[in-house]
């Protein structure tokens, strides 16, 4: 088929007898100018009639026409929701050229052809180990496909390492507890007990070391205690209880003049576009009424008249604005009054008032706006609102979505706005004299587009299924001045929903080729949208920044799942390619993180919006820390990855960890608590050439299974058994037991028999792993924290010297049952089967391994 035949025939620009708005809405038009319907809906400026046949297309083509097999759209889908905007009175030649280029891009994106191998479905399994569900005292969670837990559960190397780590920590806790060294902090969760206990034991060791008594130790002790106290205070403040009768609004709020001049001015200028769910004129009116009736007169906050919801909205806006200034790292002389406001009890006050209403039964506009502000605060705040893996956000988000649907905030406010018939009662707040039906439609549109995008966003971040199950196909218009960035993103919603459906309809059978096509379409169409927003470039950069990072994060998580599938499937060529692609993606994302922290001016992100952008950067950087150990543990399987290359990977892990925890660990509770396991993972992997970490892990867990079978395991009868927690080790044990009295090296069994992809030589495919040393260099030469306290490596010199002594002694010991290979890649194929050790000897042996890796001295302040 020739190119000319592929181009869509342009329609004639016919003269219309009704205005273009009514034609698109399919509503009645009285044919006046402006028509009555447009006057009623506030679309006066865009009420136009076509009177010539200029040959221009009647409407811009849909971004979603790339799918040639899609069904005929319904009338609702043919409507252009939310994009009937004010038309400029005239356009310059430059603008006409710009829109011509946009049309060309759209036509190209809707008519491209794919290679036949990309059109053919190719299915992969993203849940080879099943879904990951965790139950505990306070919550039950099914983790999304791309959360840390799900990634670790999918990857046999990470799953085994995490299991080993948890058992080792438990054994060390039991050992320290037997000495009466357990430490508890009532304001911190039970999961912090191990952190506090390790830390207290380390302080006892170091306080006895004369060498370490000095400024460094005192500085460490001060910083460490302040962090524990700060995060304990977070939880204590958020758990505070109030009595409605004793709450006086004036005790928490600044004077109205300061609120308007500093807080609301900052909110409207810098933050409102992030959460555009208000009509600011109406909001200011409600705040003024609240101050007049409650603050100035000293009246109690009325729940009946919904004063408490206005109060909560004010509290949340103040707290969000304060976060904006706090994380901007600007001089304290900017917004000084705002920084002096004590917001520590605000979240507890909001939660108190929210549950004074029937929040689980019915909802009004103020209450919904309060819930959305709370959701936004959970996302941005340093407290642990969403959970360490965003696993606690769905319940609040589900409440918001259900409330929206109950209130009529849905796709209809875009597709059929003229069909809304309001009855506004006299006691409604905001009242009818300040908020008319057209204002409701406008606010409804803002809220729905915002809630919709956040629902789709969480699918890309954690892989969880979208809660909003409907989408409409939206079209570009020739004007870029849509009310909000979120409304503009409606043109991408159909693609984002398709990606969600492809991923979550059957995670065990995901069409990878279709997913790649959809992601490429999303990137291309998002690029077009960015070109349309050229007039708002200054105020929208943080949104575009976040969207780009979200797409990168999704691609990273998908690549990891793809690599695991090829590994299980023994697809050698594709496994090697995905292994390299995943590593390249890790390096690329790490570079972006580095630039965010140390070259932020080049990113052109407003410093007052960093409290918002920090969150996506923190999630992405953490994902790198989760995935990098998977490369290090697999390194021995590749002929082209030498021990020196593994050391570079470990140095890279150390560099990324240092940046992540030094930039976020001091402020964010969720990052602080991850430091413990991250430090242990680093200690596990940072082994000498003679001490292969993967061999240690496998032997340890096989011994633990033997102890479990003999009834001598440390595991309490209420705990799950190792064979249930990590079934792959039980399967591996069965494979090892096939060798009766004579067996190969344990790594040979794993690589060649149990996990057979390892038996294929790199020479068979010509694979040569590219380390990308040049791109890693910033993290290998980690000097950013050499002149100040490095929270990740505190007292690391002392710990390293202790570890070096152990290594030196172990290296000089004559090994009779196992010969040490010259390099990790050269494995012994056969060796005598070592006799089984007595149970007591096994326990001693295990503690030797644990103490070698987890010497408490290594965890001064690493909890």
From Swiss-Prot:
GO terms for cellular component: mitochondrion; nucleus. SMART domains: GAL4 (SM00066). Residues 52-63 have a biased composition (Polar residues). GO terms for biological process: positive regulation of transcription by RNA polymerase II. Residues 52-99 are annotated as: Disordered. It comes from the Eukaryota. Its main location: cytoplasm. Belongs to the OAF3 family. PANTHER family: OLEATE ACTIVATED TRANSCRIPTION FACTOR 3, OLEATE-ACTIVATED TRANSCRIPTION FACTOR 1-RELATED. Transcriptional inhibitor with a significantly increased number of target genes in response to oleate. This is Oleate activated transcription factor 3. It comes from Saccharomyces cerevisiae (strain YJM789) (Baker's yeast).
């Amino acid at each position: 088929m020739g190119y000319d035949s592929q181009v869509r025939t342009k329609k004639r620009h016919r003269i219309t007898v009704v205005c273009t708005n009514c034609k698109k809405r399919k509503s009645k038009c009285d044919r006046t100018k402006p028509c009555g319907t447009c006057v009623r809906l506030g679309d006066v400026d865009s009420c136009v009639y076509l009177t010539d046949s200029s040959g221009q297309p009647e409407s811009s083509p849909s971004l979603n026409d790339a799918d040639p097999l899609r069904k005929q759209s319904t009338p609702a889908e043919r409507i252009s929701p939310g994009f009937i905007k004010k038309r400029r009175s005239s356009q310059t030649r430059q603008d006409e050229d710009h829109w011509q280029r946009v049309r060309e891009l759209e036509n190209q994106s809707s008519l491209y052809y794919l290679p036949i191998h990309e059109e053919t479905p190719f299915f992969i399994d993203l849940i080879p180990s099943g879904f990951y569900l965790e139950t505990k005292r306070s919550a039950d969670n099914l983790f999304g496909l791309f959360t840390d837990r799900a990634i670790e559960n999918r990857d046999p190397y990470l799953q085994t390492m995490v299991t080993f780590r948890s058992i080792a920590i438990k054994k060390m806790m039991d050992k320290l507890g037997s000495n009466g060294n357990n430490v508890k902090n009532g304001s911190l969760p039970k999961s912090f007990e191990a952190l506090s206990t390790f830390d207290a034991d380390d302080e006892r060791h170091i306080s006895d070391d004369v060498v370490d008594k000095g400024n460094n130790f005192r500085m460490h002790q001060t910083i460490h205690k302040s962090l524990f106290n700060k995060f304990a205070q977070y939880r204590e403040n958020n758990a505070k209880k109030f009595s409605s009768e004793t709450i006086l609004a004036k005790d928490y709020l600044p004077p109205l003049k300061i609120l308007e001049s500093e807080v609301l001015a900052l909110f409207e200028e810098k933050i409102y576009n992030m959460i555009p769910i208000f009509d600011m004129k109406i909001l200011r009116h409600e705040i003024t009424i609240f101050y007049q009736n409650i603050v100035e007169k000293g009246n109690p906050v009325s729940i009946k008249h919904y004063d408490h919801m206005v109060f909560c909205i004010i509290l949340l806006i103040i707290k969000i604005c304060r976060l904006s200034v706090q994380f901007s790292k600007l001089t304290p002389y900017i917004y000084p009054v705002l920084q002096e406001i004590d917001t520590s009890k605000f979240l507890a006050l909001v939660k108190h008032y929210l549950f004074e209403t029937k929040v689980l039964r019915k909802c009004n506009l103020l209450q919904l706006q309060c819930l959305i502000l709370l959701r936004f605060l959970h996302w941005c705040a340093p407290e642990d609102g969403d959970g360490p893996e965003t696993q606690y956000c769905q319940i609040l988000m589900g409440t918001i979505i259900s409330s929206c649907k109950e209130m009529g905030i849905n796709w209809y406010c875009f597709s059929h706005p003229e069909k809304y018939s309001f009855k506004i009662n006299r006691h409604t707040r905001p009242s009818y004299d300040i908020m008319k039906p057209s204002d409701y439609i406008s606010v409804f549109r803002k809220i729905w587009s915002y809630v919709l995008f956040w629902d789709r966003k969480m699918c890309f971040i954690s892989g969880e299924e979208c809660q909003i199950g409907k989408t409409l196909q939206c079209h570009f218009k020739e004007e870029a001045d849509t009310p909000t960035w979120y409304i503009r993103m409606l043109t991408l919603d159909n693609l984002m929903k398709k990606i969600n459906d492809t991923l979550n309809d059957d995670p065990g059978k995901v069409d990878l080729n279709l997913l790649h096509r959809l992601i490429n379409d999303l990137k291309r169409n998002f690029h077009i949208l960015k070109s349309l927003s050229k007039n708002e470039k200054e105020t929208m950069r943080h949104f575009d920044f976040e969207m780009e990072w979200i797409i990168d994060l999704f691609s990273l998580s998908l690549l990891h799942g793809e690599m695991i599938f090829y590994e299980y499937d023994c697809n050698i060529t594709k496994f090697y390619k995905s292994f390299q692609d995943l590593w390249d993606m890790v390096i690329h994302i790490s570079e972006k993180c580095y630039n965010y922290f140390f070259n932020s001016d080049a990113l052109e992100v407003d410093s007052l919006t960093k409290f918002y952008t920090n969150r996506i950067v923190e999630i992405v950087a953490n994902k790198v820390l989760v995935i990098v150990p998977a490369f290090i543990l697999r390194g021995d399987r590749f002929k082209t990855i030498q021990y020196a290359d593994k050391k570079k990977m470990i140095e890279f892990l150390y560099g990324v960890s240092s940046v992540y925890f030094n930039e976020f660990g001091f402020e964010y509770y969720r990052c602080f608590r991850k430091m413990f396991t991250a430090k242990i993972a680093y200690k596990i992997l940072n082994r000498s050439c003679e001490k292969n970490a993967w061999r240690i892990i496998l032997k340890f867990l096989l011994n633990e299974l033997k102890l479990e079978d003999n009834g001598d395991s440390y595991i309490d009868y209420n705990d799950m058994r190792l064979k249930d927690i990590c079934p792959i080790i039980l399967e591996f044990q069965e494979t090892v037991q096939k060798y009766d009295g004579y067996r190969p090296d344990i790594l040979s069994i794993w690589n060649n028999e149990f996990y057979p992809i390892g038996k294929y030589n790199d020479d068979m495919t010509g694979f040569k792993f590219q380390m990308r040393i040049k791109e890693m260099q910033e993290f290998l030469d980690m000097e950013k924290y050499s002149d100040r306290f490095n929270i990740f490596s505190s007292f690391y010199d002392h710990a390293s010297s202790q570890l070096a002594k152990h290594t030196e002694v172990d290296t000089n010991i004559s090994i009779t049952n196992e010969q040490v290979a010259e390099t990790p890649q050269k494995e012994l194929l056969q060796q005598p089967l070592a006799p089984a050790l007595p149970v007591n000897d096994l326990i001693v042996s295990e503690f030797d391994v644990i103490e070698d890796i987890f010497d408490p001295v290594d965890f001064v302040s690493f909890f």
